[in-house]
Amino acid sequence: MNFVVPDFYPATAEIFVAVMALVIMLATTFARSVARGLAYGLTLVTLIGAAIITYNTANPRAVTTFSNMFIGDLLGDVLKLLIYFSMAVALLYGRSYLADRKLDKPEYYVLALLMTLGMMVMVTSNHLLSMYIGLELMSLSLYALVAFDRDSARGTEAAMKYFVLGALASGLLLYGMSMLYGATGTLEISGIAKSVYNQAANDTVLLFGLVFLMAGICFKLGVVPFHMWIPDVYHGANTAVTLIIATAPKLAAFAMAVRLLVWGLFDVAEHWQTMLMFVAVLSIVLGNLAAIAQTNLKRMLAYSGISHMGFMLLGLLSGVVDGDPHYALDAYSAAMFYAISYVIMSLASFGMIILLSRAGFEAENIDDFKGLNKRSPWFAAMMMFVMFSMAGIPFFIGFFAKLAVLQAVVAAGYIWVAVVAVLMSVIGAFYYLRLVKVMYFDEPADATPIQAPAELRVFLSANGLAIAAIGLAPQGVMTLCTFVLLASTQP
């Protein structure tokens, strides 16, 4: 038996993050007096270093290593860069919030890095086993982060719900993967694609496996009918953790959906498209209608996120029409653009909640934003940009994300789906505009001046301005998405 030494070069960033997570654990153990600041600083250095390594090791052509378990392509590289950026911004936004509550412990940052490593493995997986390992590493880190505040009964309850439902979803996903292996005889995603294309797979077992696979993907995206955990976890976790849950994992879940469904099961698209269609429509309808009744902003954004993920799925399901992949590139590019847009908007929305929160006070109710324009006209404008963008009002990034997806849906011939999506967007605009009305036309319930670190103010301002700026010139990001997906094909 010959042992082939794998090529470590494409996976340098993953190895670097894993090593740095161990270094931070050891360093903070022996430097207790400066452990909190040291862990935070080293974590940001790690994310910046990983970004530099990923950029320098990027390959325009797809390469595989570790017995084809790891794939290095532009899709993985770009999503990893976005994950680093999202995690760095989330940690920066949350630092003062955590410090006020004595939660900025080294373990928090180690868990954040391990979660990042899990997402990196997910987006670069060409094998069902490595995909599952990355998913579990991300999930277990998230469970611990949700329960990180041991004095919060609400957080502990949310973590328990998240863990139980997450374990169930992981079991369903693993069962689906085992059935795919039974149907195709391989665990490699590229091998599964070849087996399905050559009609060498057992169709009955394959379709059963696809159903369980879809259940796992839908849970990680937080869409109907696997959405039950989203509102409770968003509400129960402290806002710094909610910010993390609502952003980077969505990019990893998008990558998982693309790798498994588009790359691996493209030739049975007519089956998973039908499932995705009903899931997406139900998510858009339920998400928007449920959000209207919410008075807690975190729960409102949770239901809003369910709706947004439904929109993203519309892009994925519109790629193939009657076996013709003519519009596939445009549709999948629209879905990727939507995922990126949602992450940018979520960073700003939860960042604003953190900005208005202080020790002993959580600004998570809609009434807490009353009269914000009188307290801070600048940040009221930033929050207005976020709400307008999420509502899909021209000319913000959210408008063009929805427009791109709707164009793909119409091109695929799903006119009734587009009509429902537009109608729900109009209805959903109510709860976004309600917050704008509260900020500009109600009297402030709290006249306390906004106190926040300079870096939070600067980055949050840049975040809000980016939502408007990309909305004015979205073509650059759309072109990037198209180029990345065009260059990222199975080797």
Swiss-Prot record:
Its EC number is 7.1.1.-. The chain crosses the membrane at residues 11-31, 38-58, 74-94, 106-126, 128-148, 163-183, 206-226, 243-263, 272-292, 301-321, 336-356, 379-399, 410-430, 465-485. It is an enzyme of class 7 (translocase). One of its GO terms (molecular function) is quinone binding. GO terms for cellular component: plasma membrane. It catalyses: a quinone + NADH + 5 H(+)(in) = a quinol + NAD(+) + 4 H(+)(out). Keywords: Cell inner membrane, Cell membrane, Membrane, NAD, Quinone, Translocase, Transmembrane, Transmembrane helix, Transport, Ubiquinone. Disulfide bonds: none annotated. It is a multi-pass membrane protein. It comes from the Bacteria. Belongs to the complex I subunit 2 family. NDH-1 is composed of 14 different subunits. Subunits NuoA, H, J, K, L, M, N constitute the membrane sector of the complex. This is NADH-quinone oxidoreductase subunit N. It comes from Azoarcus sp. (strain BH72). The lineage of its organism: Bacteria, Pseudomonadati, Pseudomonadota, Betaproteobacteria, Rhodocyclales. The gene is nuoN.
